[in-house]
């Protein structure tokens, strides 16, 4: 069990569509264990009262997941130019994004490709993270990166109707 602090991510604005976008440039998976994130300082309410009595919008976080393409391989290049083979790579055609708020924890199943935690709002969110790690790098975490990324549209920030869509 560890504690993880996630600071708000900056969204990219697409002016001609009048939308905000988060660019997913990395997915990771933990092939042999689940990973659970539980927010510990986030209200389940959309708005809360701050220490000075002011009303403030609570941040939320994105849950971005993709299943594996079981039984397939993909060739990729590492940052230092080496060619590697990714076994059971992410199925990007089935990638999904969800909005989660305080009062909601998320558990990624063993082997589920997911984006690192993405907080949207004005302040950091602290999470308790539960995950078994054996200390063998490639068994604990595997990553794939994308040059241009995958765009997730985020709309309705600060409202009960916050949405994330591809």
Describe each PLM feature range:
Residues 59-61, 96, 104, 123-126:
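A short pocket-lining beta-strand/turn micro-motif at the edge of beta-sheets
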Residues 112-144:
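A short beta-strand-loop micro-motif that forms or neighbors metal/cofactor-
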Residues 1-97, 136-139, 145, 157-166:
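Non-catalytic, conserved peripheral segments adjacent to functional cores
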Residues 144-152:
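Short, Lys/Arg-rich amphipathic alpha-helical interaction segments
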Residues 99-116:
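Conserved metal-binding segment of the jelly-roll/cupin
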């Amino acid at each position: 069990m560890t504690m993880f602090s996630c600071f708000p991510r900056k969204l990219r604005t697409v002016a001609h569509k009048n939308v905000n976008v988060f660019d997913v440039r990395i997915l990771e998976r933990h092939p042999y264990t689940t990973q659970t994130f539980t927010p510990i300082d986030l209200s389940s309410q959309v708005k809360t009262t701050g220490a000075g009595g002011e009303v403030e919008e609570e941040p939320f976080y994105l849950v971005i997941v993709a299943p594996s393409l079981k039984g397939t391989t993909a060739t990729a290049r590492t940052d230092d130019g080496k060619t590697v083979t990714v076994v059971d790579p992410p199925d990007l055609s089935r990638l999904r994004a969800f909005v989660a708020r305080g009062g909601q924890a998320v558990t990624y199943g063993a082997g589920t490709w997911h984006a690192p935690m993405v907080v949207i709002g004005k302040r950091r969110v602290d999470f308790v993270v539960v995950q078994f790690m054996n200390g063998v790098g490639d068994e604990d975490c595997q990553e794939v990166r994308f040059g241009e990324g995958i765009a997730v549209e985020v709309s309705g920030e600060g409202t009960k109707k916050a949405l994330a869509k591809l």
